[in-house]
Amino acid sequence: MSLKSVRTHFTQWNRENDVTEFETSSATVEQAAETIGVSLSRIAKSLSFRGEGDQVILIVAAGDAKIDNKKSRQTFGFKARMLSPNEVLEQTGHEIGGVCPFGLAHDPEVYLDVSLKRFQTVFPACGSRNSAIELTPKELSEFSFSKVWIDVCKDWE
């Protein structure tokens, strides 16, 4: 899985060669921003949650945004809990530090937070702790098969 599955995912749009692998780690928002040479906010981080029952939710948000539990509960109608590292790997096929909404092992519901819309391009990971791709918010929505844009974050405005 992981980087290979993400590259395979991007073949649908002939974009597999746009995935960049770095010599240094891009596993955290801070490392990714430094490695790529952009602000923290332009890193599109993917956060994995368990909803009701076996439902898995992936929320992609700007690197400077934090989940607002009240907004999240209002949006989804329940309190979601973050997945453990083992659950993340099992559900997405990606290790923490490389989680992204592409080339997933299963089909979690993918949501994009509006905190990303303020940028012309953002940089989500690509399945490994040292990879990313530059996408417009529109491309991110299309390539991730996201359900809808949501507003569940704080501290970014």
From Swiss-Prot:
It comes from Bacillus subtilis (strain 168). It comes from the Bacteria. This is Uncharacterized protein YwhH. It holds the Pfam family tRNA_edit. One of its GO terms (molecular function) is aminoacyl-tRNA deacylase activity. InterPro entries: YbaK/aa-tRNA-synt-asso_dom_sf, YbaK/aa-tRNA-synth-assoc-dom. Gene3D superfamilies: YbaK/aminoacyl-tRNA synthetase-associated domain (3.90.960.10). SUPFAM superfamilies: YbaK/ProRS associated domain.
